[in-house]
UniProtKB/Swiss-Prot annotation:
Organism taxonomic ancestry: Bacteria, Pseudomonadati, Pseudomonadota, Gammaproteobacteria, Enterobacterales
SUPFAM superfamilies: IHF-like DNA-binding proteins, TraM-like
GO cellular component term of the entry, any: cytoplasm
Pfam families: Tra_M
The keyword Disulfide bond is assigned to this record: no
Protein name, UniProt field: Relaxosome protein TraM
Function summary: Conjugative DNA transfer (CDT) is the unidirectional transfer of ssDNA plasmid from a donor to a recipient cell. It is the central mechanism by which antibiotic resistance and virulence factors are propagated in bacterial populations. Part of the relaxosome, which facilitates a site- and strand-specific cut in the origin of transfer by TraI, at the nic site. Probably autoregulates its own expression. Plasmid specificity is conferred by the TraD-TraM pair.
Gene3D superfamilies hit by this protein: 1.10.287.2320, TraM protein, DNA-binding
NCBIfam families recorded: PRK13713.1
Recorded superkingdom: Bacteria
UniProt organism field: Escherichia coli
Location(s) in or outside the cell: Cytoplasm
Keywords from the UniProt entry: Conjugation, Cytoplasm, DNA-binding, Plasmid, Transcription, Transcription regulation
Assembly description: Homotetramer. 2 homotetramers cooperatively bind to DNA although they do not contact each other; cooperativity is achieved by DNA kinking and unwinding. Part of the relaxosome, a complex composed of plasmid encoded TraI, TraM, TraY and host-encoded IHF which binds to the F plasmid origin of transfer (oriT) in a site- and sequence-specific manner. Interacts with TraD. Also interacts with TraY.
């Protein structure tokens, strides 16, 4: 194992010490959470992240093209489902049942989507 001396900022030093202290409070043994071992682990993790970013830059993945394709598929799906709902609401098997009237189905879908979206994107008081 190579030995390296390096200088780090006080902020980084304090954060590493906080990690060590937290792990000790969680019951880790003194020798398992030394400053050297923790700093080495963080350095290796940082190197993996750096290498992954470099690989991503070299890949042919185009985020804008992916977003465009994804949006196109979502719009096609939305349009198709709207037509299917319209057809289904005219079925004699469900006629007279307000639950299957087109306007009610659309409103029900919007409410359910709103609840799910709120889970992932909570509304701020500013909005």
């Amino acid at each position: 194992m190579a030995k390296v001396n390096l200088y780090i900022s006080n902020d980084a030093y304090e954060k590493i010490n906080a990690i060590i202290e937290k792990r000790r409070q969680e019951g880790a043994r003194e020798k398992d959470v030394s400053f050297s071992a923790t700093a080495s682990m963080l350095l290796e993790l940082g190197l993996r992240v750096y290498e992954a970013q470099m690989e991503r830059k070299e890949s042919a993945f185009n985020q804008a093209e992916f977003n465009k394709l994804l949006l196109e598929c979502v719009v096609k799906t939305q349009s198709s489902v709207a037509k299917i709902l319209g057809i289904e609401s005219l079925s004699p098997h469900v006629s007279g049942n307000p639950k299957f009237e087109y306007a009610n189905m659309v409103e029900d879908i919007r409410e359910k989507v709103s609840v799910e979206m709120e889970r992932f994107f909570p509304k701020n008081d500013d909005e």
